[in-house]
Amino acid sequence: MLTCNECTTWEQFLNYVKTRCSKTAFENWISPIQVLEETQEKIRLEVPNIFVQNYLLDNYKRDLCSFVPLDVHGEPALEFVVAEHKKPSAPVASQKESNEGISEVFEETKDFELKLNLSYRFDNFIEGPSNQFVKSAAVGIAGKPGRSYNPLFIHGGVGLGKTHLLHAVGHYVREHHKNLRIHCITTEAFINDLVYHLKSKSVDKMKNFYRSLDLLLVDDIQFLQNRQNFEEEFCNTFETLINLSKQIVITSDKPPSQLKLSERIIARMEWGLVAHVGIPDLETRVAILQHKAEQKGLLIPNEMAFYIADHIYGNVRQLEGAINKLTAYCRLFGKSLTETTVRETLKELFRSPTKQKISVETILKSVATVFQVKLNDLKGNSRSKDLVLARQIAMYLAKTLITDSLVAIGAAFGKTHSTVLYACKTIEHKLQNDETLKRQVNLCKNHIVG
């Protein structure tokens, strides 16, 4: 093996990289690499694991070409050897020793844990048509973890209650199933956790910890996109827990089919139940406003609550922001709440009740999102039951929400005006008796106007 002084080419590369990445990244990913052999034809490197090798090539391949020998294809002539971590033979550990090992790694891993928010519980989650289904699913899996809907995949826009439900599941299980091991973590924290254990050469300890869980709660899985190496480890953990009938709950801003992840992990996420959290309707927004106001000791009359909810309709966080602003104004200036006060204090948050012009394309995108179908399929000619229904709802909403003629609407869908008319009559007839369809149509409307 060459000494460090002999590794001049590699040292030059290291000095170059140090100036182009953070100290943490260098220590985590570059510093652990050791030179085993260096010749004019190639360099042999020892890496602690395959993640480090892939990181080096994914991020510094072009730079490596300027320093290290190249092969006949113009690629860096590097040979990688993954270090072997030999363990002395030992008798099989007892259950007590095994638990102690898991407890030890828990102490290392808990720094990455997302603490459950004490305010996020089922009993203070305001229910409405846009979230009724997903809340019922969350309550169901919290009551019987691992029995059904596994994994539960919750998706929806920012500030609509995904994290609230995730933490509510954690609280319920912790209180009603005290013997179960629970871990709540953001995707970014999972990645940082893995980096930490890669650096300390203790990935096996991390694997043992995660695979000893009874309930894994993962927030914002969309941040796993474009992180292929970490995605593989997450997928392995995911599969192990599912195969052991351990419950997993995941949140995301998109349904699995729209995430830029491998087909393998997308298929796994769709194994259980995929549930959408929609934009709350007016009545639900009013209920949320009044609940948040009550928590702050602020009394909002119904008329005023409806007025605010009619002008703030993006998400729950905006409603919370409005309450915080009104509470601060009343306390700081010692004034009571009036319509003028509301209008002046919240004017920067208000949006006009007459939303921006709605187009057929807007309607198609919203319906595709709500029904979790591809936009091209919705515009196409597929006669599958789900697509036909979604397409008819889109036509019905186009006729209801925009002023274009049936001919123009039909042209936008690539259909005749008679097809649009038939679709509208079909949906209107079904709406008279089908409560599920009513909820679906309202969900689409909320998504469009929100």
UniProtKB/Swiss-Prot annotation:
Gene Ontology process terms (BP): DNA replication initiation; regulation of DNA replication
Localization terms from the record: Cytoplasm
Residues that hold ATP according to the record: G159, G161, K162, T163
Region (Domain IV, binds dsDNA), start-end ranges: 331-450
Chain segments carrying region Domain III, AAA+ region: 115-330
Segments for region (Domain I, interacts with DnaA modulators): 1-87
InterPro entries given in the database record: AAA+_ATPase (IPR003593), Chromosome_initiator_DnaA (IPR001957), Chromosome_initiator_DnaA-like (IPR020591), Chromosome_initiator_DnaA_CS (IPR018312), DnaA_C (IPR013159), DnaA_dom (IPR013317), DnaA_N_dom (IPR024633), DnaA_N_sf (IPR038454)
Pfam families: Bac_DnaA, Bac_DnaA_C, DnaA_N
Chief place where the protein resides: cytoplasm
GO terms under cellular component: cytoplasm; plasma membrane
A single MF term (Gene Ontology): ATP binding
Alphabetized Gene3D superfamilies for the sequence: 1.10.1750.10, 1.10.8.60, 3.30.300.180, P-loop containing nucleotide triphosphate hydrolases
Residue ranges of the region described as Domain II: 87-114
Classification via SMART domains: AAA, Bac_DnaA_C
Function according to Swiss-Prot or TrEMBL: Plays an essential role in the initiation and regulation of chromosomal replication. ATP-DnaA binds to the origin of replication (oriC) to initiate formation of the DNA replication initiation complex once per cell cycle. Binds the DnaA box (a 9 base pair repeat at the origin) and separates the double-stranded (ds)DNA. Forms a right-handed helical filament on oriC DNA; dsDNA binds to the exterior of the filament while single-stranded (ss)DNA is stabiized in the filament's interior.
Assigned protein family: Belongs to the DnaA family.
HAMAP family, per the entry: DnaA_bact
Assembly description: Oligomerizes as a right-handed, spiral filament on DNA at oriC.
Comment block on domains: Domain I is involved in oligomerization and binding regulators, domain II is flexibile and of varying length in different bacteria, domain III forms the AAA+ region, while domain IV binds dsDNA.
Protein name: Chromosomal replication initiator protein DnaA 2
Organism whose genome encodes this protein: Chlamydia pneumoniae
Taxon lineage: Bacteria, Pseudomonadati, Chlamydiota, Chlamydiia, Chlamydiales
Gene that encodes it: dnaA2
